[in-house]
């Protein structure tokens, strides 16, 4: 590959070499506009075309665009010249996880953190039908905050790579981390193969060495095929049990990610993580309470009891009224499905749902609180007519949270918008479809998009309601 450019398309300064492979080199870069650090992967177009790998490059781009997750290296943009293809990616200052493990085994809590983040990333990719197929410490990077980032999707597979039997058939990956069914050149399930590799990574993090290793490659394959490994004496019993289930040579009986999350070792670490988070929240709240406890005149909290409730589920701000936002005709047009321009911008337009209701705002709020309690969601008021609902447990992409905002069209006619503010979009869609919609049915008049046109009965009801309210407004006051 020819010498690197010092500036890439007037957008990035290109700096030192970070690493290289057969067909590509990765350089440190910096955005000229924002000063943000990036990693720039330069691929020799001629080399990849000679060996027929251009489709693999295209697949890697597709996968990285699908797999947007906090624990997956983000692809910012792709550029190309006559001789090169450039991937501009998230820069991970901490380097490879391999470098940490090379110095020796990690503490249990540190190993748990990395394993937890790895499982979250892999689970998310699988939910998008993306299978990595080359999970190993060299492909797991660390950012500035020591958070894990899965990288190098060059060997990954999409669901459409499967044959008619529904299995993958390409042998790939690093031998010491590859599942037995992949080595045997049989069709394999990408999900199960990735779980095996995650099991090997977990062993390496806790032991500091590989579970399957031999100078003779065929002997190593034999050990992998029989799951012939010995756990060190310092491994806790619950870790041994989990590893035996992850490194099960039979893919049919190998543990699933859902069951990994339920394992005692995984839950124990999660419990410790939640305790730390709760402690941090209490510390933040105590600091905020100290600063908010006095006003400009040095007086304490007001006597009207307008502070947050003790249970923290419902927070009412002192300056906020209970009245929802009023909508005018232009607001309604902008919010209507027919005028929604979000689809033009290529984003997934499934992150929000709207419904209309003929119930008063107080009834809608009470119903939201009741449903939140039933679905084990926390709910708190942010401002007039706006509520934050959150799941108590982390999902594939962190805590799933959504905003429910009530808009007043008339005193007895409201529009409610439920919008995802954090977490996985697929989890949000499932929650809305399977839980929220049925639970809210008795206050919903119609969901947006459910019917393109209102039924004649609904139209008549709405017109009558509008006429009645107009008459009430026009009727002169009598003293």
Curated annotation (Swiss-Prot):
Q: Which InterPro entries match?
A: Kinase-like_dom_sf, NAF/FISL_domain, NAF_dom, Prot_kinase_dom, Protein_kinase_ATP_BS, Ser/Thr_kinase_AS
Name the reaction it catalyses.
L-seryl-[protein] + ATP = O-phospho-L-seryl-[protein] + ADP + H(+); L-threonyl-[protein] + ATP = O-phospho-L-threonyl-[protein] + ADP + H(+)
Residues with the modification Phosphoserine, per the entry, are 156
User: Where do Basic and acidic residues bias regions lie?
Assistant: 311-323
| UniProt cofactor(s) | Mn(2+)
**One of the GO BP terms on file:** signal transduction
Task: Tell me the active site.
Answer: 134 (proton acceptor)
Report domain Protein kinase positions.
12-266
| List of residues that carry Phosphothreonine | 170
Quote the tissue specificity entry.
Mostly expressed in roots.
Please state what class of enzyme this protein is: transferase
Q: Where is the NAF domain?
A: 322-346
Q: Which residues bind ATP?
A: 18-26, 41
Induction record: By salt stress.
- Region (Disordered) location: 286-323, 456-479
**What Gene3D superfamilies does UniProt report for this protein, alphabetically?**
Kinase associated domain 1, KA1, Transferase(Phosphotransferase) domain 1
Give its E.C. classification number: 2.7.11.1
Q: Which UniProt keywords apply?
A: ATP-binding, Kinase, Manganese, Nucleotide-binding, Phosphoprotein, Serine/threonine-protein kinase, Transferase
Among the GO molecular function terms of this UniProt record, one is: ATP binding
What binding partners and quaternary form does the record give?
A: Interacts with CBL4/SOS3.
Q: What is known of its domains?
A: The activation loop within the kinase domain is the target of phosphorylation/activation by upstream protein kinases. The PPI motif mediates the interaction with the ABI (abscisic acid-insensitive) phosphatases.
This protein's name: CBL-interacting serine/threonine-protein kinase 10
Q: Which organism is it from?
A: Arabidopsis thaliana
């Amino acid at each position: 590959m020819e010498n690197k450019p010092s500036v890439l398309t007037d957008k990035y300064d290109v700096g030192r070499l970070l690493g290289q492979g057969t067909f590509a080199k990765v350089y440190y870069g910096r955005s000229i506009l924002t000063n943000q650090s990036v990693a720039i992967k330069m691929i020799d177009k001629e080399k990849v075309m000679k060996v027929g790998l251009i489709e693999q490059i295209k697949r890697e781009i597709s996968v990285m665009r699908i797999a947007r997750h906090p624990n997956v290296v983000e692809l910012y943009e792709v550029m190309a010249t006559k001789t090169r293809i450039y991937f501009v990616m998230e820069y991970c200052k901490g380097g490879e996880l391999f470098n940490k493990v090379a110095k020796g085994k990690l503490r249990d809590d540190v190993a748990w953190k990395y394993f937890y983040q790895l499982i979250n990333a892999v689970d998310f990719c699988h939910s998008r039908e993306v299978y990595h197929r080359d999970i190993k410490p060299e492909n797991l990077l660390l950012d500035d905050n020591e958070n894990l980032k899965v990288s190098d999707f060059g060997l990954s597979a999409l669901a459409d790579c499967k044959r008619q039997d529904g299995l993958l058939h390409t042998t790939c990956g690093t031998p010491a981390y590859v599942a037995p069914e992949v080595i045997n050149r049989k069709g394999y399930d990408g999900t199960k193969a990735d779980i095996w590799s995650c099991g090997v990574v977990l062993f390496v993090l806790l032991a500091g060495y590989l579970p399957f290793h031999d100078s003779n490659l065929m002997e190593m394959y034999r050990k992998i095929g029989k799951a012939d490994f010995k756990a060190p004496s310092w491994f806790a019993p619950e870790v041994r049990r989990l590893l035996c289930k992850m490194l099960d040579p039979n893919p049919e009986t190998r543990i699933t990610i859902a069951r990994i999350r339920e394992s005692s070792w995984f839950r124990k670490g999660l419990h410790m993580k939640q305790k730390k988070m709760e402690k941090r929240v209490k510390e933040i709240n105590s600091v905020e309470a100290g600063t908010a406890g006095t006003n400009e005149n040095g007086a304490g909290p007001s006597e009207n009891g307008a502070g947050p409730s003790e249970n923290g589920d419902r927070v009412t701000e002192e300056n906020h009224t209970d009245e929802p936002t009023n909508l005018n005709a232009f607001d309604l047009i902008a919010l209507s499905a027919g005028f929604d321009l979000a689809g033009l911008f290529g984003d997934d337009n499934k992150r929000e749902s709207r419904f209309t209701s003929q119930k008063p705002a107080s009834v809608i709020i009470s119903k939201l609180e009741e449903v939140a309690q039933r679905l084990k969601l926390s709910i708190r008021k942010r401002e007039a007519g706006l509520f934050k609902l959150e799941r108590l447990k982390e999902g594939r992409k962190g805590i799933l949270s959504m905003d429910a905002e009530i808009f007043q069209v008339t005193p007895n006619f409201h529009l409610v918008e439920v919008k995802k503010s954090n977490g996985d979009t697929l989890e949000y869609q499932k929650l809305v479809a399977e839980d929220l919609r049925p639970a809210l049915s008795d206050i919903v008049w119609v969901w947006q998009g459910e019917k393109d046109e209102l039924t004649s009965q609904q139209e008549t009801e709405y017109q009558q309601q509008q006429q009645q309210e107009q008459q009430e407004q026009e009727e002169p006051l009598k003293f």
